[in-house]
Amino acid sequence: MQKKTNKNLRNIAIIAHVDHGKTTLVDKLLQQSGTFKKHEEFSERIMDSNDLEKERGITILAKNTAIQWKKYRINIIDTPGHADFGGEVERILSMVDSVLLVVDALEGPMPQTRFVTQKAFSYGIKPIVVINKIDRKHARPNWVIDQIFDLFVNLNATDEQLDFPTIYTSALLGTSGVSYNHMNPDMIPLYNAIVKYTPPPTVYPNCPFQMQISQLDYDNYLGIIGIGRINKGSVTSNQSISIINNTEVKRTGKIGKILQYLGLNKIEINEAQSGDIIAITGIDKLNISDTICDPQYISALPMLKIDEPTVEMLFSVNKSPFSGTEGKYITSRQIFNRLKKEENYNVALKIKETNDTNTFSVSGRGELHLSILIENMRREGFELEVSRPQVILKTINELIQEPMETVVLDIENKYQGTIMKTIGQRKGTISNITPDQNNERTRLDCIISSRSLIGFRTEFSTLTSGSGLFYSTFSHYQKIESNKIKRHRNGVLIANKTGQAIGFSLFNLQNRGKLFITHGTKVYEGQIVGIHNRVNDLTVNCLSGKKLTNMRASGSDEAITLTTPIKMTLEYAISFINDDELVEITPKSIRLRKRYLKENERKILLRNIKE
């Protein structure tokens, strides 16, 4: 088997923690390489194509691009930085020969940095460390380098991996340098580092064709697009191939078009060589991990390893009285087809049918992972109901065990006591407390169960007035210490009739608690309209107006002033509900409701539970 290297090709991924600037870095690499032509419009965060990505400032789906710099073609994959989307990260690492590990010059390595770096080390990849945001006030690059070295040691890095090259950048300003004291006004030092320290791919030009599907895309005209790196040989358009999963021959097919990345475009080519990352069309029902190979030399590549889901939710057809009034897709078949389509692309997601034909079990890597899916479906016109997230338990060595997570909280000092108390209530363990160099903020390192984290993100944001930073990643499984985690949530106010809420009635209810609705809001019997001041649920009438009389008032009526209702976001709703409640999601509304809408049904259920 003749082995060579393609000296003018580099395959590299960019991995980093959320909001450490990797997407902006890719923008600048594309811009300064000359890959964009003069007539092409440039916008910031060009690699984030998903609306949710731009709104939240995070990367959810891995993106592929390539730049031509001098004689070198550099394939770049911008990967997610959040562990909930780690399924994307793992597949990407199977396609590249090096990674740019982007770390904030002030914050240093964070939990997701640890997560993706550990994955990279497991593939034997040597990283190029990029200390980004070097222009930040109070940047501390030397401290960050020490933190990265300690992290690598803890992850059992080899001597070669510990001898990592470092480049300093400000992606925002488009500058880089091998020393933070001597910065170039461009990205040339970073281009040079990529070419110098990324090994050119090993190629087998004379072997039969073989590649593995690491990503899937879809085009309305081209259909399913399979993306992967050619492991051996070469491929031409219209070539006959076999599609296999592990060692089982599945079927034969024919490749349609071969597409190569350049900038933000896919360019059609007639032939692609070993080592390159390409996209192919013409093959239906492709799956992640499928091996595409020469029919005469069938050989499957090892299946890609993906961490298992840790959280599950039930997705159901919307059965509320307002069902079908706001959405376009409302049937169980439409919801199931959409979920199965998502499962094809979203490899960390698992869909199962249940005994109820209108309900499906959806499991993923965390609350954020599933809430992104729900939000996307909502924007596409779907109506559905979802349950409270439940942690997936495992039986290991005849013991029931639950997933544990490493959590890092970055908070202002004044909130430290409150947050530490909350962590204790959720059975978490604080392993380290680190004040920052200005003694204004504190970093808390904790180990806490995934079960305890459900709803904590929203509570944490409220307790820190939005100023706290929250990071988490899966750590390990361990025996359940306590079956019950105390939830300090009051009871709820439940509407007893269907109609439009009246301001006069809501005004009188304000003394009972905080409301989710305002005057004129349509409500139905069994809908949750507010939070009760006490721990019990209370059924209320929010439709009654002021009694009319035939007597003229001696003075003017008092003006009714309603307090601003609590803003209902998807994350808040999912974390707020109890097991006997559901979140109703439509393109226009997010409502909370009881599973049983009739008050007498709820009373019977409560009585049976007590007995």
From Swiss-Prot:
CDD domains (UniProt xref): BipA_III, BipA_TypA_C, BipA_TypA_II, TypA_BipA
Molecular-function annotations in GO: GTP binding; GTPase activity; guanosine tetraphosphate binding; ribosome binding; rRNA binding; tRNA binding
Main location: cytoplasm
Catalytic activity: GTP + H2O = GDP + phosphate + H(+)
Keywords (A to Z) from UniProt: Cytoplasm, GTP-binding, Hydrolase, Nucleotide-binding, Ribosome biogenesis, RNA-binding, rRNA-binding, tRNA-binding
Keyword ATP-binding annotated: no
List of residues binding GTP: D19, H20, G21, K22, T23, T24, N132, K133, I134, D135
Enzyme class: hydrolase
Subunit structure: Monomer.
Protein's recorded name: Large ribosomal subunit assembly factor BipA
Organism: Buchnera aphidicola subsp. Baizongia pistaciae (strain Bp)
Gene: bipA
